[in-house]
Amino acid sequence: MEIRNIKEFEKASKKLQKDTLKIALALLFLIGAALLALIFGQANSKGLLLIFAAVIGGYMAMNIGANDVSNNVGPAVGSKAISMGGAILIAAVCEMLGAIIAGGEVVSTIKGRIVSPEFINDAHVFINVMLASLLSGALWLHVATLIGAPVSTSHSVVGGIMGAGMAAAGMSAINWHFLSGIVASWVISPLMGALIAMFFLMLIKKTIAYKEDKKSAALKVVPYLVALMSLAFSWYLIVKVLKRLYAVGFEIQLACGCVLALLIFILFKRFVLKKAPQLENSHESVNELFNVPLIFAAALLSFAHGANDVANAIGPLAAISQTLEDASSPMGSTLNSVPLWIMVVGAAGIALGLSLYGPKLIKTVGSEITELDKMQAFCIALSAVITVLLASQLGLPVSSTHIVVGAVFGVGFLRERLREQSRRRFARIRDNIVAAHFGEDLEEIEGFLERFDKANLKEKSLMLESLKKSKNTAIALELKKKEKKSLKKVYKEEVIKRSILKKIVTAWLVTVPVSALLGALLFVALGFIEKYF
């Protein structure tokens, strides 16, 4: 008893030390954000207010890293394509690069079109709206991370701006037309994610998983899938990065993307051919070919997430900074470029939040939503890559959470349909087998089929292997080759595990109203503090 208590005390002590170190690092980062605002911010006499806003922006960025980045690397970690440490390192680097290189366009979207300019002409009121929205979004994300619920950072910030804007100038201040486009993108994104993931999962099943010679099929198909992913990402990079230096037409963009995709195809084809002698003709062995593509997908998603969701952390901060520099036009239509120091606060905050507090939700997304193998994880990741890059290019602050979970929904729905079909197929196969046999063998065969129907996946695999080895048994002799093949196909199509989605769906539903309520309350609280203190 005493030894157990000592071990529990040591465990609690180590956890406390670890948590204390995390808090210390987070505080150091917030101090760094304040120093950046002090040194590089140009807020004239309102420097203290800008420093406070920078701290809140850094706090928001850390919460985005802790909560939202899990969607990018969760499938890769959950399928064991990459370790937790490797995933965090890749995601942190790519998040920072995406935020700094390609994050400006979405920042401009967040910055001035959610609240109609003509309703808030006072710079002081506008700054309070932005502060309230930023803090409300950060607080809700913090709570969601503590309870282990991956939520939309876009929903959190937009809800906060809505609530604070309505508290400041009423419902008429909200640009409902613009928000309707954002809401539409929130619906379209998970739907696109689901449909694309379903398509690729079915494609992989038809072209690889259901083939007798899985090894040869995978060596042919996987390089094309990687090339497609490369095309999407390279085209995105050309559009987002090169357009700042030199404007190119669509034809040139597509041609450059195709050239890069072809190069990746050739390199990856050589890679899989070198790996071919080590592969076996089995599902598990073929799965290993998806390791590198999954790591590649995690990097792409992280880059796109940094480009897209950095706006949620620094959009309001950029608006506050610009307003403090030019108070005469707080909601003007002309948007200045976002200062580099603000981009650094957002990018570094996301990377630090991921490193310190990201593993919890990475495990949630990677294993609790659904149990994935590498093929299924690749379908989800590829679907998310295509959807989120398209959305980011359009300048829409969509939710990567919705995209990834939408893809999981799609994969789960397809697997559920396949399971139902496999059950019906098994019933037909059973009837056909029973009808074709009689006598003493029939009783033994019926017993085998009943055990097969009730067995889990691992047990089914062992039972099918026993048919190959037990050539002298009645079952092995009486079950025809075609009947064994049919049973094998039923085994392949059974679903491993149903997704646990209630917590995530509930979090989606309450994010906007909760963040809006917090935004309104914080706006009122800021006004009260300024008036009486």
From Swiss-Prot:
One GO BP annotation of this record: phosphate ion transmembrane transport
Domain of life: Bacteria
Subcellular location(s) per record: Cell membrane
One cellular component term from this protein's GO annotations in UniProt: plasma membrane
PANTHER family named among the record's database cross-references: PHOSPHATE TRANSPORTER
Function: Potential transporter for phosphate.
Name used for this protein in its record: Putative phosphate permease jhp_1384
Organism of derivation: Helicobacter pylori (strain J99 / ATCC 700824) (Campylobacter pylori J99)
